[in-house]
Amino acid sequence: MAQKKGGGSTRNGRDSESKRLGVKVFGGQAINAGGIIVRQRGTRVHAGENVGIGKDHTLFALVDGHVQFAVKGAAKKQQVSVVPAA
């Protein structure tokens, strides 16, 4: 006779792949035009000077330069800009 009962089954054991969201280039770091600065869902960080926004709300540099983060307005919204290289 078998020494073990059947293993049964479970409804657990699944998880989605991580989406690798977040800041990719931090304040003060150099970036090339087209380089991704932030990957995000929604506009947690807003686009400032020389920063474009993709259809998935990804922020990217429009010019070569250095990344600069700031907090703007009464609502204290975070904004990222690119200061052009001299």
Curated annotation (Swiss-Prot):
GO terms for cellular component: cytosolic large ribosomal subunit. GO terms for molecular function: structural constituent of ribosome. Gene3D superfamilies: 2.40.50.100. SUPFAM superfamilies: Ribosomal L27 protein-like (SSF110324). It comes from the Bacteria. One of its GO terms (biological process) is translation. Keywords: Ribonucleoprotein, Ribosomal protein. PANTHER family: LARGE RIBOSOMAL SUBUNIT PROTEIN BL27M (PTHR15893:SF0), RIBOSOMAL PROTEIN L27 (PTHR15893). Belongs to the bacterial ribosomal protein bL27 family. This is Large ribosomal subunit protein bL27. The lineage of its organism: Bacteria, Pseudomonadati, Pseudomonadota, Betaproteobacteria, Burkholderiales. The gene is rpmA.
